[in-house]
């Protein structure tokens, strides 16, 4: 019996992979409540400064809704793929304007090949460099950005939401998505409602201010949540011989658990547990951590967990270390 088979047996015996309909019903209603609050504030407040605060709040709400799309893509919510896909299409395409099909393909490629050059799309993000060879291959403006990427990282992720929207549109134009027509209609509906409401309720320049703040916060929040997961962790050689268990554990970083952290990070602070068992419901990750952390210690498998602040220090330190190859 392989180590992962042994671990999966323990996780199954504890019922941690069982679906959690009550929990996800609560999360869906909570997020819809957040969204409704933001929309009501948009309709009743006639003050650009207060609407700027609302734009920040809505950036937070969009990311929280995005976590639901992430969970549905991993089949955490329902047993059947179709039901999960329907949730993903609604929260992804309709509510936040990001293609569920694009995200599903992109994210599954990452899960199957974490921190592997040419295979993991998360380490092929222009204009950053995640390993030495990648840094040395940069030219022109991207080389300049990589040279100072430790300083540019957080300003760059302000555009993370915009980047995902552009990728979504390109995906639907160029690829035969399973739900291509449905996705296209829902995406068009999102932008029609989003832009229509803002420009009709706020007017020209105020709507543009709201959009700029809203999308920047959406990108910053989302990028900050995803950053600690793997950035600065070991990059694997293309011919590595690691089994599934070791590959997923040593390339991931956990952030120390706390109810507030769990909420803010949408459960992604349990990145090791999530990568080992992607379909494990979000509210069972903390319980799974107790099992998996103990299992890794027993079998001398490196298990990296740190604080929120230290995780960002490690990430920026890694970016500075990679950029040193250009400074040299």
Predicted regions and their residues:
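Membrane-proximal, cysteine-centered motifs at transmembrane boundaries in secretory-pathway
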Residues: 17-18, 280
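Active-site-proximal flexible loops/turns
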Residues: 38, 77-78, 225, 237, ...
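Membrane-embedded catalytic scaffold of the fatty acid hydroxylase/desaturase
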Residues: 57-176, 241-326
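Membrane-interface elements of multi-pass transporters and channels
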Residues: 44-48, 72-80, 98, 110, ...
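Alpha-helical bilayer-embedded segments of polytopic membrane proteins, i.e.
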Residues: 19-65, 92-97, 150-162, 177-225
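Transmembrane alpha-helix/helix-exit interface in multi-pass inner-membrane proteins
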Residues: 158, 222-239
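Membrane-proximal N-terminal segments immediately preceding the first transmembrane helix
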Residues: 2-15
């Amino acid at each position: 019996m392989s180590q992962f088979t042994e671990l999966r047996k323990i996780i199954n015996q504890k019922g941690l992979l069982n679906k959690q309909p009550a929990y996800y019903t609560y999360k869906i209603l909570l997020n819809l409540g957040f969204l409704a609050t933001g929309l009501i504030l948009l309709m009743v407040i006639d003050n650009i400064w207060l609407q700027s605060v609302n734009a920040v709040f809505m950036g937070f709400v969009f990311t929280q809704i995005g976590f639901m799309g992430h969970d549905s893509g991993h089949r955490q919510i329902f047993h059947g793929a179709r039901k999960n896909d329907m949730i993903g299409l609604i929260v992804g395409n309709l509510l936040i304007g990001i293609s569920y099909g694009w995200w599903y393909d992109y994210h599954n490629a990452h899960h199957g090949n974490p921190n592997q050059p040419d295979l993991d799309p998360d380490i092929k993000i222009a204009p950053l460099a995640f390993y030495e060879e990648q840094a040395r291959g940069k030219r022109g403006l991207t080389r300049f950005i990589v040279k100072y990427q430790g300083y540019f990282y957080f300003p760059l992720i302000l555009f993370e939401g915009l980047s995902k929207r552009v990728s979504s549109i390109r995906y639907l134009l160029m690829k035969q998505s399973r739900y291509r027509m449905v996705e296209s209609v829902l995406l068009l509906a999102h932008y029609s409602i989003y832009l229509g409401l803002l420009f009709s309720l706020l007017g020209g320049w105020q709507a543009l201010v709201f959009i700029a703040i809203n999308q920047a916060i959406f990108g910053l929040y989302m990028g900050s949540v995803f950053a600690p997961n793997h950035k600065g962790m070991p990059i694997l050689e293309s011919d590595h011989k690691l089994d599934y268990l070791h590959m997923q554990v040593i390339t991931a970083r956990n952030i120390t658990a706390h109810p507030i952290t769990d909420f803010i990070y949408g459960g992604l602070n349990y990145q090791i547990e999530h990568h080992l068992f992607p379909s494990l419901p979000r509210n069972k990750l903390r319980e799974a951590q107790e099992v998996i952390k103990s299992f890794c210690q027993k079998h001398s498998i490196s298990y990296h967990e740190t604080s929120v602040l230290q995780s960002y220090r490690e990430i920026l330190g890694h970016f500075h270390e990679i950029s040193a190859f250009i400074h040299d």
